[in-house]
């Protein structure tokens, strides 16, 4: 029914000798000759004007065509045309040299309008059925078919049904004409002392319709010099100077240019620190653009000479405003400026052509006086005791009473950093350790002398006397290292209540209650070799038992270190367990068998007794001899430590080294020198780890 209505709307008959025009606005339709499919009338003329929306064109094709033949279509014909152009003229039944039928040919209008005219003359000798044609609107792909440069897209074209639109590459914006792509280049600021400026997209053609502004703004005192490169291509005109695209350079009120064409301008010295470069392009042209480099120039500063033993960086033939120079010195030298030493010093060329400061001098590094070494000496390798770079000194310890730890060379060199350096210790000073167990005065091992004998003065320099402040001695001890005394723990507390034999802090002697005397020989008399020292702190062995005398050992820390000499020297800690039968010497000021105190230091030589033998000797008395104890003495008695000797040293000689080692400290026994009753001593080897942990003493 729909096609029937369309057929009646488009196909109708016309009277003879009449002309008729039909206006068609649909997007598609059908056109037929009058009376189709019957023969068309003579002397007839019909025009169909087809109009579709902009962005479309009209496609026309024939399904049937049968008209009168004539030379060049003089009689009957169908003419297809636009406003100003005939697209085709058809007649006849088939194409010949002088007439053309549409056949399968499709006729396309260039625009949105097409006019189709059918005309028949006054007579037809035969029956001709006319034509049946169809038309439809088809989209125009403007992106492919647009040939007019002023209407085509600069960058990207996007077609859609009935039209198209343009877009631009990244960094560009679309002009108000909706087809031209331009750049936003009006706020380019350059502040570096050198740089390169180009037209947008250089060396590709620069965008159209652009207004670019480049500002070079340097610190006052500089002058901008411009240099265009060889590639220079800006649209120009053979008769009018730069009417289309151009560069202008503005320096203050002065304007240079315009510049265009293919010849680059000569180098330009602006004599200013502020320059504006303007670049204009119109809406046409395909030129490559331009590129220039700029460089800041300033006043020249005088030539520089490096200081003696120094250098300047960078080293240049000429220096200009804002150039900076760093002055440094050779290894072992320091920059000296206004009596201040520094690693480097920087000066700058000022805008008036002068340097910001004078070149400083280079002074040799001075390590100054080396640090004092406790118990040591310093020897300079140079005659004048120089302390400057590469000078050498040697530390040594006060022999024979001190030795250097780890046998260090003690040689230090003044380094480039201004500090004394040792290859092993770096800047740390060496350590002088007390020499132990090597008395200046040697003794002869005594044969079996009953009840001991007076000790030769200076042969026991490690012995210490524990004395009340009133001068009354009460125990002995041994010097360890430079500031510790090892003694018996029972020497440092009062007698305990037999009914409550618990050791309390209140039972302990206060450090202020007693003193230590070193270099002592006479029991009560004094001489010039003695050193009286205060007590800083006391430490009892944590497992000390005052009832059984287990771990009967204590340490006394001195307020100050004694001066080591021929009469004061520490004893060495044992390096291993003591062998049974080895001879030891016990020293002290304790009572003799006549139950009176001696005038001088006494000593006895006795052998070490087997541990099991000692245990059996005390078994009847129900007294334990534990592993932290060691026994010594004669089976027949007569030689033993006694009251007043507690805490005193029991030592032995290492014959290979000639050094004396501490074996034990006097602890307890059954009477003094009694037969089958040996002296019991606190075994130092058993407690060596604890002693070293508290004191830090090493041999």
Swiss-Prot record:
Activity regulation field: Inhibited by SERPING1 and A2M.
GO cellular component entries: cytosol; extracellular region; extracellular space; nucleoplasm
Domain Peptidase S1 span(s) in chain numbering: 449-696
Residues the entry annotates as binding Ca(2+) 3: 235, 245, 282, 284
Residues that bind Ca(2+) 1: 68, 76, 121, 123
Gene3D superfamilies, sorted: Complement Module, domain 1 (2.10.70.10), Laminin (2.10.25.10), Spermadhesin, CUB domain (2.60.120.290), Trypsin-like serine proteases (2.40.10.10)
Phenotype upon changing residue 239 to A: Partial loss of interaction with FCN2, FCN3 and MBL2
Glycosylation sites: 49, 178, 385, 407
Limits of the EGF-like domain: 139-182
SMART domains recorded: CCP, CUB, EGF_CA, Tryp_SPc
Effect ascribed to mutating residue 68 to A/Q: Partial loss of interaction with FCN2, FCN3 and MBL2
Record-annotated active site: 490, 552, 646
Tissue: Protein of the plasma which is primarily expressed by liver.
All residue ranges annotated as the CUB domain in the record: 20-138, 185-297
Domain Sushi, first and last residues per copy: 299-364, 365-434
Binding annotation for Ca(2+) 2: 139-140, 142, 159-160, 163
Impact noted for substituting residue 122 to A: Partial loss of interaction with FCN2, FCN3 and MBL2
Region listing for Homodimerization, in residue ranges: 20-184
Annotated signal peptide: 1-19
E.C. numbers: 3.4.21.-
Enzyme type, top EC level: hydrolase
Biological function: Functions in the lectin pathway of complement, which performs a key role in innate immunity by recognizing pathogens through patterns of sugar moieties and neutralizing them. The lectin pathway is triggered upon binding of mannan-binding lectin (MBL) and ficolins to sugar moieties which leads to activation of the associated proteases MASP1 and MASP2. Functions as an endopeptidase and may activate MASP2 or C2 or directly activate C3 the key component of complement reaction. Isoform 2 may have an inhibitory effect on the activation of the lectin pathway of complement or may cleave IGFBP5.
Disease: 3MC syndrome 1: A form of 3MC syndrome, an autosomal recessive disorder characterized by facial dysmorphism, craniosynostosis, learning disability, and genital, limb and vesicorenal anomalies. Facial features include hypertelorism, blepharophimosis, blepharoptosis and highly arched eyebrows, cleft lip and/or palate. The term 3MC syndrome includes Carnevale, Mingarelli, Malpuech, and Michels syndromes.
Name of the protein in question: Mannan-binding lectin serine protease 1
UniProt organism field: Homo sapiens (Human)
Gene: MASP1
